[in-house]
UniProtKB/Swiss-Prot annotation:
This is Small ribosomal subunit protein uS15. SMART domains: Ribosomal_S15 (SM01387). One of the primary rRNA binding proteins, it binds directly to 16S rRNA where it helps nucleate assembly of the platform of the 30S subunit by binding and bridging several RNA helices of the 16S rRNA. It comes from Granulibacter bethesdensis (strain ATCC BAA-1260 / CGDNIH1). Keywords: Ribonucleoprotein, Ribosomal protein, RNA-binding, rRNA-binding.
Length: 89
């Protein structure tokens, strides 16, 4: 259920702001969004997996915090990112 190393590298290179950028909010939000999508698919088939559901809620909260931070610092980057990721806002 976790992200493969190849997929993680692809996401980092796609959303990175510089060559070796792995910690920018854009990269972190993209990685969290991928994990959230994987957990959502898992929960569609395993509806009673409450431990995974709690993990999903924690990831969503973490992503929400990073999105709030990015919106507070640079609204243009925030708008571009949610458009690229297809998040509803």
């Amino acid at each position: 259920m976790s992200i493969t190393a190849e997929r993680r590298t692809a996401l980092i290179s796609e959303y990175a702001r510089a060559a070796n950028d792995t910690g920018s909010p854009e990269v972190q939000i993209a990685l969290l969004s991928e994990r959230i999508a994987n957990l959502t698919e898992h929960l569609k088939t395993h509806a009673k997996d409450f431990h995974s559901r709690r993990g999903l809620l924690m990831l969503v909260g973490q992503r929400r915090g990073l999105l709030d931070y990015l919106k507070r610092k640079e609204v243009a980057r925030y708008d571009a990112l949610i458009k690229r990721l297809g998040l509803r806002r």
